[in-house]
């Protein structure tokens, strides 16, 4: 069977910005028969995420992410439907997901590496398993729970950078749900600021591209900052940390402003900012959601419940077609998305 797949065509270079041309689509032949334990799946939706920028380098700089190889298929979060199965626990018509889904229209996969999902958890919105009711949702929920030290009724202020992205848009809402009295988002357009305050319930939003970020933050956070959900790093984070209170907490989710730079992760803070962090006893620890697998199942159920109750609003930016994986990735890395960036590969989930 001839299918289409996306392979890594070139590397951006250690400090280069990724472009769509770093990827290419090619035809590929799948075996005609399945081995025991395998399933044939049709891909419905694929995810593009900031962490993938690290996988474009020869060395990812982390021990839990393997780099993509040139001329080899790229992979990431994906969801699809089983078309044929030689696996004991999976049957034709099952919906399955994986963190290592190949960027292909169809694939033959080891059934043990797939997780069966229940469409009822997302009211039929299968792509949500790649966002709010999937890894970004778990990253936001577990990150805030484990590293935010939020206690309801203690009048805490939370700031979220990259607030209109997949994790940021969820983290701010979760901050409110867990007890923060004030949540402020930082993003890069007025449209995104309005989205945060009018649709997601953020109390204020700061546009880092207009005006002085530190001044806007002082106005939005008169009592200082107690919890900082950091998606971006760099100058924005330095401005936030400078206004954090004593014994406050940084949830280090990502550093998208630094992913194209050849620096260690997490990047060290400038000496003046690091001095503030130490003086005020601000915690700043790397957070990796994969270290909390025991919390995944209850986390997914909690996220699904909030979504069904209308307490957790979900926003997606949807591209269409496998040929647009590179375009969608480049757009997401430059802030072109609101909410989770998804690529629809096949809309028809029926068999």
UniProtKB/Swiss-Prot annotation:
The name this protein carries in UniProt is Prostaglandin reductase 2
Q: What is the top-level taxon of the source organism?
A: Eukaryota
Tell me its EC number(s), please. 1.3.1.48
- InterPro entries, alphabetized: ADH-like_C, ADH_N_2, GroES-like_sf, MDR_fam, NAD(P)-bd_dom_sf, PTGR2
Q: Name one GO molecular function term.
A: 15-oxoprostaglandin 13-oxidase [NAD(P)+] activity
Q: Which residues are listed for NADP(+) binding in this entry?
A: 165-168, 192, 208, 231, 253-259, 287-289, 337
Originating organism: Mus musculus
In terms of SUPFAM superfamilies, this protein maps to:
GroES-like, NAD(P)-binding Rossmann-fold domains
UniProt KW keywords: Cytoplasm, Lipid metabolism, NADP, Oxidoreductase
Q: Which cysteines are joined by disulfide bonds?
A: none
Reactions performed catalytically: 13,14-dihydro-15-oxo-prostaglandin E2 + NAD(+) = 15-oxoprostaglandin E2 + NADH + H(+); 13,14-dihydro-15-oxo-prostaglandin E2 + NADP(+) = 15-oxoprostaglandin E2 + NADPH + H(+); 13,14-dihydro-15-oxo-PGF2alpha + NADP(+) = 15-oxoprostaglandin F2alpha + NADPH + H(+); 13,14-dihydro-15-oxo-prostaglandin E1 + NADP(+) = 15-oxoprostaglandin E1 + NADPH + H(+)
Which residues of this UniProt protein bind substrate? 99-100, 288-290
Q: Does the keyword Oxidoreductase apply?
A: yes
Q: What is its main location?
A: cytoplasm
Mind telling me which GO cellular component terms the entry cites? cytosol; mitochondrion
Q: What is the uppermost EC class here? A: oxidoreductase
Its annotated compartments are: Cytoplasm
Identify its protein family. Belongs to the NADP-dependent oxidoreductase L4BD family.
UniProt tissue specificity = Widely expressed with highest levels in adipose tissues.
What the protein does comes down to: Functions as 15-oxo-prostaglandin 13-reductase and acts on 15-keto-PGE1, 15-keto-PGE2, 15-keto-PGE1-alpha and 15-keto-PGE2-alpha with highest activity towards 15-keto-PGE2. Overexpression represses transcriptional activity of PPARG and inhibits adipocyte differentiation.
User: What does the record note on quaternary structure?
Assistant: Monomer.
According to its UniProt entry, the protein's GO biological process terms are: prostaglandin metabolic process
Gene3D superfamilies cross-referenced by the UniProt entry:
Medium-chain alcohol dehydrogenases, catalytic domain, NAD(P)-binding Rossmann-like Domain
Cytoplasm listed as a keyword: yes
């Amino acid at each position: 069977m001839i299918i289409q797949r996306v392979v890594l065509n070139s590397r951006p270079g250690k400090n280069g910005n990724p472009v769509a041309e770093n990827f290419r689509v090619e035809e590929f032949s799948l075996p005609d028969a399945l081995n025991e334990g395998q399933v044939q799946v049709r891909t419905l939706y694929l995810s593009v995420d900031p962490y993938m920028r690290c996988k474009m380098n020869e060395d990812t700089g982390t021990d839990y992410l393997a780099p993509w190889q040139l001329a080899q298929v790229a992979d990431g979060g994906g969801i699809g439907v089983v078309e044929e199965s030689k696996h004991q626990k999976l049957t034709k018509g099952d919906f399955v997901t994986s963190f290592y889904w190949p960027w292909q229209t169809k694939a033959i996969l080891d059934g043990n590496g797939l997780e069966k999902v229940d469409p009822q958890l997302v009211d039929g919105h299968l792509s949500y398993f790649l966002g709010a009711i999937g890894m970004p949702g778990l990253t936001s929920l577990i990150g805030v729970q484990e590293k935010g030290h939020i206690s309801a009724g203690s009048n805490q202020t939370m700031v979220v950078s990259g607030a209109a992205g997949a994790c940021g848009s969820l983290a701010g809402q979760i901050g409110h749900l867990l007890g923060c009295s004030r949540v402020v988002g930082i993003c890069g357009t007025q449209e995104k600021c309005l989205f945060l305050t009018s649709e997601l319930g953020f109390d204020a939003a700061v546009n880092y591209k207009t005006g002085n970020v530190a001044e806007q933050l002082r106005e939005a956070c008169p009592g200082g900052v107690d919890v900082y959900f950091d998606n971006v790093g760099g100058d924005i984070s330095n401005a936030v940390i400078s206004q954090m209170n004593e014994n406050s907490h940084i949830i280090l989710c990502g550093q998208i402003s630094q992913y194209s730079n050849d620096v260690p992760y997490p990047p060290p803070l400038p000496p003046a900012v690091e001095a503030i962090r130490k003086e005020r006893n601000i915690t700043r620890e790397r957070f990796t959601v994969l270290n909390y697998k025991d919390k995944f199942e209850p986390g997914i159920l909690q996220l699904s419940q909030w979504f069904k109750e209308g307490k957790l609003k979900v926003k997606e930016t949807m591209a269409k077609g496998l040929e647009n994986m590179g375009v969608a990735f480049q757009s997401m890395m430059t802030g072109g998305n609101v909410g989770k960036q998804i690529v629809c590969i096949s809309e028809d989930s029926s068999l």
